[in-house]
From Swiss-Prot:
Keywords: Chloroplast, mRNA processing, Plastid, RNA-binding, tRNA processing. This is Maturase K. HAMAP family: MatK. It is found in: Plastid, Chloroplast. The gene is matK. InterPro entries: Domain_X, Maturase_MatK, Maturase_MatK_N. It comes from the Eukaryota. Belongs to the intron maturase 2 family. MatK subfamily. GO terms for biological process: mRNA processing; RNA splicing; tRNA processing. One of its GO terms (cellular component) is chloroplast. The keyword tRNA processing applies.
Length: 511
């Protein structure tokens, strides 16, 4: 426990000061808008009237922030409509978004500078080579084939907004900045009395995407940082209850029994049994925890996670958000693929002199398929086909030029085909390609008031086929950095960060 407290204090001591004065620097907004910050997306603030970013409005906002009664009046008179008088609704809506986005931009700076200021001898190695998303699956095949159980985790989100502010207190020791963040969160949560905390979070996410992404990433970073520590120190933590103590004694007796029955059973093997190999993968607000061990051990880790969220982050999560499945008898959804590790029968014939033997064995194979029903549902929602997969025209695109229509359909088709080409079964991909190709032909025929047959005879089917098979490298993953964490002695943990460069809306259903 002393190690945990010391590690926690060391983690909390990395605080940043003097963040609030940066909000008054004009160049911060211009720099973030023109170039982005450390490779992130450029800031584009959109108001209710589709008015985009304006440096002049930022300058006016900074001048208003210098006025002492600007925020004071907003705090003392919360019933006023949206930070300002109800007559200036547009400016109040726009100013509130600029303030929140500017706060997120400024707070990101010290976190980015901390990564860039590491010593040369401890510099994080970077791999600038681009790799396809399909390189992930050989990695999973190499790691998951020897595991037994898989836990699907829906990462919970704090319902109370004050928890997010408390998490930032560990990193930022700037009281005015934290007060400003509280002001924004309370402003959105108290806008209407009937809005619950979860609805206020969704409303905040809709209007201030950058701020919500920063708060969510801070929460996930804090959760994973201590989760990794608990993983490394799970066998070293003190026993908290008598039941666990008796369980440890019973396990020690089993170890002695193994030592008597099997003298060659080394301590290293027993340590591997006590502390089995685990792999943790997080994506799209979900996580996968795969390990080699018993079902009872996975249930214990489930209880650990629930108690960890409850006692450290002060909110309760439902146990149903963590599903435990046997890896050999279930499939899991990972980045648009349905992956599984089935056991395939294999018949081997062995010839020894005049005798031959047939050996029936089973081998594990990492299989990835495309969820056809799900993707057809997304195409149907985007009005490319019916719910049963019958292609239809896209009337909203008939006002575009022929080249724009072909370009849009071709880009969607190439993106889907390139992203899901790692599937072991290509039949679904050809069906999606057929739907988009025929939907494009129907759209062009509708625009020219002709039939699909006449249109295809005039242009030729080879033109569409050549257009849809044009290669375009749009999806790639970058192995940007690996970090070595050292918690106890010489044990280290290698963590890979995968940055998705670009992804299509149809491929990513969360967008």
């Amino acid at each position: 426990m002393e190690k945990f407290e010391g590690y926690s204090e060391k983690h909390k001591s990395r605080q940043q000061y003097f963040v609030y004065p940066l909000l008054f620097q004009e160049y911060i907004y211009a720099f973030a808008h023109d170039y982005g910050l450390n490779g992130s997306e450029p800031v584009e603030i959109v108001s209710c009237n589709n008015k985009k970013f304006s440096s002049l409005l930022v300058k006016r906002l900074i001048i208003r922030m210098y006025q002492q009664n600007f925020l004071d009046n907003s705090v003392n008179h919360p019933n006023q409509d949206r930070l300002l008088d109800y007559k200036n609704y547009f400016y109040s809506e726009f100013y509130s978004q600029i303030l929140s986005e500017g706060f997120a931009i400024v707070v990101e700076i010290p976190f980015s500078l901390r990564e860039l200021s590491c010593p040369k001898e401890k510099e994080i190695p970077k791999f600038q080579n681009l790799r396809s998303i399909h390189s992930i699956f050989p990695f999973l095949e190499d790691k998951f084939l020897h595991l037994d159980y898989l836990s699907h985790i829906e990462i919970p989100y704090p319902i109370h907004l004050e928890i997010l502010v408390q998490l930032l207190q560990y990193r930022i020791q700037d009281v005015p900045s934290l007060h400003l963040l509280r002001f924004f969160l309370n402003y959105y949560s108290n806008w209407n009395s009937f809005i619950t905390s979860m609805k206020s979070i969704l409303f905040l996410q809709k209007e201030n995407k950058r701020l919500v992404k920063f708060l969510y990433n801070s929460y996930v970073s804090e959760y994973e940082f201590f989760l990794l520590f608990l993983r490394k120190q799970s066998s070293c933590l003190p026993l908290a209850s008598s039941g666990t103590f008796l369980e440890r004694i019973h396990f020690s007796r089993k170890m002695e029994h193994f030592g008597i029955m099997y003298p060659g059973f080394s301590r290293k093997t027993l340590w591997f049994f006590m502390d089995p190999l685990m792999h943790y993968v997080r994506y799209q607000g979900k996580a996968i925890l795969a390990s080699k061990g018993s079902f009872f051990l996975k249930k214990k880790w489930k209880c650990y996670l629930i108690n960890f969220w409850q006692y450290y982050f002060f909110f309760w999560t439902q146990p149903r958000r963590i599903h435990i499945n046997q890896l050999a008898n279930s499939c899991f959804d990972f980045m648009g693929y349905l992956s599984s590790v089935p056991k395939s029968p294999l018949l081997v014939r062995n010839q020894m002199l005049e005798n031959s033997f047939l050996i029936d064995t089973r081998m594990k194979k990492f299989d990835t398929i495309v969820p056809a029903t799900l993707l057809i549902g997304y195409l149907s929602k985007a009005q490319f086909c019916t719910g049963s997969g019958h292609p239809i025209s896209k009337p909203i695109w008939t006002d575009l030029s022929d080249w724009d229509i072909l370009d849009r359909f071709g880009r969607i088709c190439r993106n889907l085909f390139h992203y899901h080409s790692g599937s072991s079964k290509k039949r679904t991909l050809y069906r999606l390609k057929y739907i988009l190709r025929l939907s494009c032909a129907r759209t062009l025929a509708r625009k020219h008031k002709s039939t699909v047959r006449t249109f295809m005879q005039r242009l030729g089917s080879a033109f569409l086929e050549e257009f849809f098979t044009e290669e375009e490298q749009v999806f790639s993953l970058m192995f940007t950095k690996t970090t070595l964490f050292s918690f106890c002695g010489s044990h280290t943990e290698r963590i890979w960060y995968l940055d998705i460069i670009r992804i299509n809306d149809l491929v990513n259903p969360l967008n």
